[in-house]
């Protein structure tokens, strides 16, 4: 490990990205394939991700399923030579200090990508996400069209939640695109990294990348509040300071869109509260009850054809009834309120899964494997 740290230190001081060695760009999972060739290979097979780990060939994720390539196992030099040329000196310093880094990069004639470079068993590893070039629509994502109404709101906090890889960023991009097509609004996004690049139409859109344009979410969000934006997108609410500022922004005339890592809509309320000291939670609960506009919890579920994946969504709209329950601390009643809120655009995850089964998009066993409350789902399926 010390030898590798010394190597990183030397690279920080001596990096010359204008003249990378042939060796650094030629070694990949398939004999002498370059990173560009590997990524083009992955894109041609419809992969969403490429995973590089020492001791295994490059692995593709296609329709949610991992598929190893036929190349030989990667060694430590393979991964280093593929990944380190992507990094600026400051990013190498961050990798050395934090042992992990996220960044976006573009390969000409290949595409746009997001990569997480990290360490495992004393060696570099990487997970590369292939980014679509087209901004998705709610329809192309197979999400309810009613979600488009959230993009028309003038203020409030809209949260998209779910596990990693469930499409949260794509959902946010679709909502921003609706704003861009319908409103003369000033939109500012804070992302780590920027994944979808929006072109100005009706709106003016600024996209700020953490690590390149700003040090972190919280600092930038405070600064943005002085720039009179109409819509703010925070890629992820990672800490109490960011959450508090986002709630304040949503209360004071801004539409704020963000994400959390929770499985369902109700957990989003608890997740925010638990980020604050107990003494502050009553005040934060009041803020949530006033600022929250909606929570969209989603997951991608394998289709009945074995190829496609379909989004199952739990949607909680902040109606007067929902706000009252949050304000009083009756979070245990929120799910019941969601289940009877179809007229307001709400549904539970089990109701969404049942709809997918009835539409012959997923089978019953798959729905049962992805539900949170088995008895509820069985009741909806009949």
Language-model segment annotations:
Residues 2-382:
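Short, flexible helix-loop junctions that flank or precede catalytic/ligand sites
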């Amino acid at each position: 490990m010390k030898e590798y740290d010394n190597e990183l230190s030397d690279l920080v001081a001596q990096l010359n990205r204008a003249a990378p060695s042939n060796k650094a760009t030629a070694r990949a999972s398939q004999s002498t394939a370059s990173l560009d060739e590997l990524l083009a290979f992955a894109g041609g097979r419809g992969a969403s991700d490429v995973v590089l780990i020492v001791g295994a060939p490059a692995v593709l994720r296609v329709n949610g399923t991992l598929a190893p390539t036929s190349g030989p196992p990667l060694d430590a030099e393979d991964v280093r030579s593929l990944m380190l040329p992507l990094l600026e000196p400051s990013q190498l310093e961050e990798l050395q200090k934090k042992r992990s880094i996220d960044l976006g990069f573009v390969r000409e004639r290949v595409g746009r990508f997001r990569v997480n470079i990290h360490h495992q068993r004393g060696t570099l590893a990487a997970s590369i996400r292939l980014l679509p070039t087209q901004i998705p629509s709610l329809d192309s994502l197979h999400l309810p069209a009613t979600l488009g109404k959230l993009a028309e709101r003038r203020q409030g906090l809209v949260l998209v939640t779910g596990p990693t890889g469930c499409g949260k960023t794509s959902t946010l991009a679709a909502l921003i695109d609706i704003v861009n097509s319908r409103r003369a609004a000033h939109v500012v996004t804070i992302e780590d990294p920027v994944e979808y690049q929006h072109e100005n139409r009706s709106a003016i859109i600024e996209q700020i990348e953490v690590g390149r344009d700003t040090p972190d979410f919280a600092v930038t969000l405070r600064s943005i509040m002085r720039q009179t934006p109409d819509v703010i997108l925070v890629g992820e609410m990672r800490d109490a300071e960011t959450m508090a500022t986002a709630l304040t922004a949503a209360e004071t005339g801004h539409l704020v869109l963000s994400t959390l890592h929770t499985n369902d809509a109700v957990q989003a309320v608890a997740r925010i509260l638990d980020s604050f000291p107990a003494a502050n939670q009553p005040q934060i609960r009041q803020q949530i009850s006033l600022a929250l506009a909606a929570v969209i919890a989603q997951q991608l579920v394998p289709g009945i054809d074995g190829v496609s994946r379909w989004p199952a969504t739990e949607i909680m709209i902040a109606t007067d009834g929902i706000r009252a329950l949050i304000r009083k601390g009756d979070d245990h009643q929120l799910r019941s309120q969601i289940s009877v809120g179809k007229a307001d655009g709400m549904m539970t995850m089990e109701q969404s899964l049942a709809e997918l089964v009835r539409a012959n998009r997923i089978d019953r066993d798959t729905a049962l494997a992805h539900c949170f409350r088995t008895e509820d789902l069985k009741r909806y399926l009949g």
